[in-house]
């Protein structure tokens, strides 16, 4: 039977519950246990797919095409299990499911209430999510409950966790509570009162934490831990100090050294082998002792909020670990490039345009792409970044000065990028598509296997086949591909059934390293294995740096 560890948060949000849960899961996995993770989001949105990145950060896409919380990206980077749609659910999904059941008469005319109907549904969703990995035989499922204790939105989830613990009995559920211990500079001391109140609030709900993770900007002294232990009624060895680290990959070792995994295993009556964190130590060592250093310019419109590009930033760091390179990222606001200021691109070793939606800032991105192409700076375009590379190429090298995407200009004379429902086929006819003819109707989501053309950079990077995840509404218009290819562009991967361009590149005679991909490779990069595309990109940046210095 799967055992559960519920991870809750108190005092303030954004303390790093996702990193803490993923780190504990990584330690338990290193002890030989089969682990999986779930994220419960208290907001009423059905999923984060239509939420602004400024509000919610990155939307992480799973292999089965679910648009989920960015914490699922952390989970996949820390453990071997692949996340699925059932690993993340929201209040919106719970209420939607309960209301559908009520309409179908499944409650036999009873008054539908938060307790028991909503809380029972939450428990059913938790058990379904835990069974999605390891053929339903996970040893431990870590369940992160979003929000903070005391939020009205979180109450049904906390109540469901309490009921689940009661129903399953002792030694089947553990609770880890993450809280803040702020340092007050004017007083010169750490303050434990917010943590005391947070634990009291949790105990009022009926939950007593097995362990307390105390976040601070510095290690918490033993006397403060003893004070927290006394007032929170938790053994002192269960009060874990979690201070700010310069790398999230140091957290598993930090928690292991203080015995968090031992406490959890004792509570759940598990007796696995000792933890082996040598892989994490090796990765941290590679990160802290690079032989090279490069600067990559990331040109986007969400550059003030790096949470919007969380997986991409981590993928570049992974590539750095596997190439002994410190990867510095320069965030460049694409709107500032629209009025000039291209000189900020000159010192860069490589340029990257990530995915995105909407017209704002696109002309600045196109100018950055043109600069990269003309100045032979390594370029990687992801999703929108590939589409804009096609537009830039069509305008300046293929004789289509008005080339654009119908996302930005419905009246463009040359729609080289078009909506999934309005492609022009090889005969010049508008081809209408539906949910039956394309994954997700107007949004292509999830993983897809695609063959790769021989003799291309893509083939050297990926081999014969690429299997990556998608999240987009627009595609390169096949009607214009022959013209683009005649001008020198190489379409190096196409979907097997629709024949849609998945990867584009420029030949070495035109540019040393210029690649665009319609998919999102950042979602499959892990610190353990890195990612072949990002590794090749960093190596191209190093080669460019050497050419500049020669």
From Swiss-Prot:
PROSITE patterns cross-referenced by the UniProt entry: GATASE_TYPE_1
Binding of Mg(2+), residues: 71, 144
Claim: Magnesium is one of the keywords in the record: yes
Catalytic activity as recorded in UniProt: UTP + L-glutamine + ATP + H2O = CTP + L-glutamate + ADP + phosphate + 2 H(+); L-glutamine + H2O = L-glutamate + NH4(+); UTP + NH4(+) + ATP = CTP + ADP + phosphate + 2 H(+)
Binding-site list for ATP: 14-19, 71
Binding residues annotated for UTP, in chain numbering: 13, 191-196, 227
Active-site feature positions: 383, 520, 522
Biological process (GO), any one: 'de novo' CTP biosynthetic process
Xref: Pfam families: CTP_synth_N, GATase
Description of how activity is regulated: Allosterically activated by GTP, when glutamine is the substrate; GTP has no effect on the reaction when ammonia is the substrate. The allosteric effector GTP functions by stabilizing the protein conformation that binds the tetrahedral intermediate(s) formed during glutamine hydrolysis. Inhibited by the product CTP, via allosteric rather than competitive inhibition.
InterPro entries hit by this protein: Class_I_gatase-like (IPR029062), CTP_synthase (IPR004468), CTP_synthase_N (IPR017456), GATASE (IPR017926), GATase1_CTP_Synthase (IPR033828), P-loop_NTPase (IPR027417)
GO molecular function list: ATP binding; CTP synthase activity; glutaminase activity; identical protein binding; metal ion binding
Binding site for L-glutamine: 356, 384-387, 407, 473
Pathway(s) where this gene product acts: Pyrimidine metabolism; CTP biosynthesis via de novo pathway; CTP from UDP: step 2/2
Role, per record: Catalyzes the ATP-dependent amination of UTP to CTP with either L-glutamine or ammonia as the source of nitrogen. Regulates intracellular CTP levels through interactions with the four ribonucleotide triphosphates.
Other observations noted: CTPSs have evolved a hybrid strategy for distinguishing between UTP and CTP. The overlapping regions of the product feedback inhibitory and substrate sites recognize a common feature in both compounds, the triphosphate moiety. To differentiate isosteric substrate and product pyrimidine rings, an additional pocket far from the expected kinase/ligase catalytic site, specifically recognizes the cytosine and ribose portions of the product inhibitor.
Record-stated family: Belongs to the CTP synthase family.
Subunit annotation: Homotetramer.
NCBIfam families referenced in this protein's UniProt entry, alphabetically: PRK05380.1 (NF003792), PyrG (TIGR00337)
Protein name: CTP synthase
Record organism: Cupriavidus taiwanensis (strain DSM 17343 / BCRC 17206 / CCUG 44338 / CIP 107171 / LMG 19424 / R1)
Phylogenetic lineage: Bacteria, Pseudomonadati, Pseudomonadota, Betaproteobacteria, Burkholderiales
Gene: pyrG
